[in-house]
């Protein structure tokens, strides 16, 4: 543990040297271990029960399946799992935090990375190196700001009116079709498969800075995010 705390000698390139790798569930069969958990206790048994319930939901053609995401799991390496759920028609809609969709998925679709770090790292040194920390995961603040600027540029090109987060994220998906550096992002996969993504707190992420910059450049003709209309769309699904 002391070694983890004593990282102040590392420079930025050293701190951002070990990428987070997203797990690929298509490369192994986890059914046996999940099934065996049904005879265990605590969270293990609940995980097996959840898998059984999910299987029943998939069999029920009248069941609408929402995938709900928290930002931390996305940064931790689960984005390909979520992408594959969309790819294989296992979800009907997604409700996520702005951090999951913009700071993690869109961020990586632009070619940027998340890096393995340490929760014991001196945050003062990280600040000096313009590195943001998500528990034990790092991202480059310069790259995050570039991501925000692109969000603003996408907004600049849209008709100035109100949009739900679903509509705006759909425009992001359209942008990625021709501009992504990393193919197969969740946003792009959802765009290709017509799976709506909702971010009820869209601006509760760095994407908010991008939209602020957009409104500063276009004080009289800018887009807005309509949370009330979005709520109605969600209830109609």
Spans of model-derived segments:
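Conserved catalytic alpha/beta core of Sir2/sirtuin-type deacylases, generalized to analogous enzyme cores
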Residues: 2-69, 74-237
């Amino acid at each position: 543990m002391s070694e983890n705390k004593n990282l102040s000698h590392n420079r930025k390139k050293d701190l951002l040297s070990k990428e987070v790798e997203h797990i690929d569930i298509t490369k192994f069969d986890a059914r046996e271990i999940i099934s065996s958990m049904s005879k265990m206790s605590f969270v293990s048994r609940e995980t097996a029960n959840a898998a059984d319930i999910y299987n029943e939901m998939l069999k029920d053609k009248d069941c609408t399946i929402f995938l709900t995401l928290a930002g931390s799991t996305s940064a931790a390496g689960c984005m390909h799992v979520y992408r594959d759920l969309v790819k294989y028609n296992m979800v009907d809609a997604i409700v996520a935090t702005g951090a999951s969709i913009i700071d993690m998925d869109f961020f990586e679709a632009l070619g940027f990375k998340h890096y393995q770090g340490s929760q014991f790292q001196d945050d003062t040194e990280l600040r000096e190196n313009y590195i943001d920390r998500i528990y034990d995961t790092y991202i480059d603040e310069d790259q995050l700001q570039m991501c925000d600027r692109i969000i603003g540029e996408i907004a600049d090109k849209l008709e100035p009116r109100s949009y739900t987060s679903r509509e705006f994220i759909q425009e992001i998906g359209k942008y990625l079709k021709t501009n992504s550096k990393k193919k197969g992002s969740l946003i792009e996969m959802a765009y290709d498969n017509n799976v709506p993504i909702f971010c009820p707190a869209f601006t509760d992420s760095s994407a908010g800075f991008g939209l602020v910059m957009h409104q500063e450049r276009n004080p009289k003709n800018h887009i807005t995010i309509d949370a009330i209309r979005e709520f109605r769309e969600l209830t109609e699904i």
